[in-house]
A protein has these predicted regions:
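Primarily a LysM-type cell-wall glycan-binding module
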Residues: 2, 28, 34, 39-83, ...
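N-terminal signal peptide
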Residues: 4, 12-36
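Loop/turn positions that initiate beta-strands
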Residues: 99-103, 127, 161
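Short acidic beta-strand-loop surface patches of small beta-rich interaction domains
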Residues: 86-94, 148-155
């Protein structure tokens, strides 16, 4: 019995030598954050910067939907380059992309404060709200909390024609991730 207890203890000790805690890079936003613009959780602002990496070329994904259904219109909305979008996705810059097709969009991602973001200007149209712009127009690539934090317009009264700064969520791989072969391209 003593030998059995010692064997169990020895096995546990050996296994503990191989223990490596998982280190997650980011927290993900949950449904209540997406549907509630009045909260201000830190995770709704974007992904935290790694102290050693300040910027990178990254990408986001976007589903083509009218009026954002050409490489040109998607580039204009997301502050990217139509020629790069067209090349990556093997489409023409000006041809209509089939509705709901997932498009890879290259963006310049940089650390602003302690959050990775890509900034894109957006001109407000009638009936726009931060919530509608974040969730419908930008398809969740930003949050209404991040937009409210970045712009000075009253959330209940954004004037038509106002140009908003949209902080698009992006992230760059850490040095450890890059060493492991992960790239942002």
């Amino acid at each position: 019995m003593e030998l059995f207890s010692f064997s169990i203890l020895y096995a546990c000790l050996c296994l503990s030598l191989f223990y490596q805690p998982a280190r997650t890079q980011q927290a993900y936003i949950n449904g209540s954050t997406l549907w509630n613009c009045s909260g201000n959780p830190a995770t709704s602002k974007g992904y935290l910067c790694d102290a050693s990496v300040k910027s990178c070329e990254a990408f986001v994904t976007f589903r083509s939907r009218a009026p954002h259904d050409t490489a040109i219109s998607i580039a204009y909305l997301l502050g990217s380059e139509a020629s790069k979008i067209a090349s990556i996705n093997k489409v023409s810059a000006s041809d209509k992309i089939p509705s709901n097709k997932l498009i890879v969009v290259p963006v310049s991602c940089s650390c602003s404060g302690n959050i990775f973001q890509h900034y894109s200007p957006y001109t407000v149209i009638k009936n726009d709200t931060y919530f509608k712009t974040a969730n419908d127009t930008y398809q969740g690539l930003t949050t209404c909390q991040a937009m409210i934090g970045q712009n000075y317009y009253d959330p209940e009264n954004i004037p038509v024609g106002a140009v908003l700064t949209v902080p698009v969520r992006c992230a760059c791989p850490s040095e450890n991730q890059t060493a492991d072969g992960i790239t942002s391209r």
